[in-house]
């Protein structure tokens, strides 16, 4: 398996092909992506410049491959880090597997509600040629289920990435150049999740974090976010998709960087 270049290629491909995703247009969910991005900027003064440079790279890639008609298929190994404070938060393997199934259907456009794609987007909605599987080997090369669990004394997490570090009550990422890391935990404040935007350099916090009862479509899930679409939404941020309103703090001056 390729490492950094492998995931970089996937992120670029997905940023180009994920033109329309049902989870993005569902009833408004409490996504904390903007808050998390602002947190990251306080830690890295060059983050915004790096993101803009990365977006330029994507646009250059699109321009140089405008006539390309075939696509390369990718299957990405996911590791799910379950961080729980109560028994109910320690979701089952079946619930985790149901989430992988939803991701594969959404990214492959085999989801049953694909027929509801708005007419304006029907011509560009497509199979991304990206699929997901639970990792079969851990970073040491040992057999793995792609799931790890930890009981924590932390009752709820926020957008400050503490869930991504063992020393702060969470679980450390597996090598982010070889795995997509996905954390499942309990949020405070009614948050459902967030995903980290790419910058061209893969950090040890890269991945998505999802509220435990908005993960998957079976088991301990709570309506109306019991369809597994929150993870689809947050992973789309990891693949460089913005909210359509531009995440500008309500100023109405932002952009989702997609030509309408």
Language model region names:
Residues 14, 24-73, 107:
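N-terminal zymogen propeptides
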Residues 62-104, 184-187, 251:
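Fold-level signature of zinc-dependent metallopeptidase catalytic domains
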């Amino acid at each position: 398996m390729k490492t950094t270049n492998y995931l970089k290629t996937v992120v670029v491909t997905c940023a180009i092909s994920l033109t329309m995703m049902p989870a993005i247009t569902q009833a408004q969910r409490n996504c904390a992506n903007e808050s998390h991005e602002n947190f990251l900027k306080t830690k890295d003064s060059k983050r915004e410049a790096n993101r803009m440079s990365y977006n330029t790279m994507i646009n250059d890639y699109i321009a140089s491959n405008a006539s390309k008609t075939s696509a390369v298929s990718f299957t990405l190994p996911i590791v799910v880090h379950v961080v729980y404070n109560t028994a109910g938060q320690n979701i089952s393997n079946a619930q985790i597997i149901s989430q992988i199934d939803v991701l594969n259907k959404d990214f492959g456009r085999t989801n049953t509600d694909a027929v509801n794609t708005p007419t304006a987007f029907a011509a560009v909605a497509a199979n991304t040629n990206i699929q997901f599987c639970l990792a079969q080997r851990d970073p040491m090369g040992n057999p793995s289920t792609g799931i790890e669990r930890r009981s924590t004394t932390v009752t709820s997490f926020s957008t400050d990435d503490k869930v991504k570090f063992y020393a702060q009550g969470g679980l450390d990422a597996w090598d982010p150049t070889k795995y997509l890391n996905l954390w499942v935990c309990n949020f405070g404040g009614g948050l459902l999740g967030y995903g980290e935007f790419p910058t061209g350099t893969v950090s040890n916090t890269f991945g998505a974090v999802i509220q435990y009862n908005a993960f998957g479509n079976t088991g301990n899930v709570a309506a109306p976010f019991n369809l597994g679409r929150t993870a689809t939404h947050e992973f789309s941020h990891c693949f460089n998709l913005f909210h359509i309103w531009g995440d500008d703090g309500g100023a109405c001056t932002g952009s989702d960087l997609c030509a309408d």
